[in-house]
């Protein structure tokens, strides 16, 4: 299935000069959504845990984990997860941010696939990789719906042994 047909361009969103890749048409089409989740699950079938960042990583990571009957671990911004959390600060284009996971869900030696909607600069994924490695996880795969190749995110997260799979590249 050609998933590019289900991703539309929106000019000047979220601000002037930006060409936004809108995945809403894909989410609104049951067959395209099913194909996406099935494809992601096929790639992730040999890992122990699926991890995804808030918010759109949840849209693809949770159903991927459910199809595989594997746990899904949320990565969120501060103050969104109860209990003991592990934090990692990371740089953005203009400033920085913090990501957190709950401390008791990742076990040392577990293999992980990170699932998200878009790979742009790679900053978020790189921070998640560091956060998970600090917990002793083995990151095997990064599975992305849409990769913006001009932004070189793949290069910024390319580490030994991590397979990066994008279903669509622009």
Curated annotation (Swiss-Prot):
Enzyme class: transferase
Assembly description: Homodimer.
Native organism: Mycoplasmopsis agalactiae (strain NCTC 10123 / CIP 59.7 / PG2)
Membership in a protein family: Belongs to the purine/pyrimidine phosphoribosyltransferase family.
Enzyme Commission number(s) of this protein: 2.4.2.7
One term under GO cellular component: cytoplasm
Glycosyltransferase among keywords: yes
HAMAP family to which the protein is assigned, alphabetical: Aden_phosphoribosyltr
InterPro entries the UniProt entry points to: Ade_phspho_trans (IPR005764), PRibTrfase_dom (IPR000836), PRTase-like (IPR029057), UPRTase/APRTase (IPR050054)
Single annotated GO MF: AMP binding
Domain of life of the source: Bacteria
CDD domains, per the entry: PRTases_typeI
The protein, known as: Adenine phosphoribosyltransferase
Keyword entries, A-Z: Cytoplasm, Glycosyltransferase, Purine salvage, Transferase
PANTHER family associated with the record: ADENINE PHOSPHORIBOSYLTRANSFERASE (PTHR32315:SF3)
Catalytic activity: AMP + diphosphate = 5-phospho-alpha-D-ribose 1-diphosphate + adenine
Gene of this entry: apt
Pathway: Purine metabolism; AMP biosynthesis via salvage pathway; AMP from adenine: step 1/1
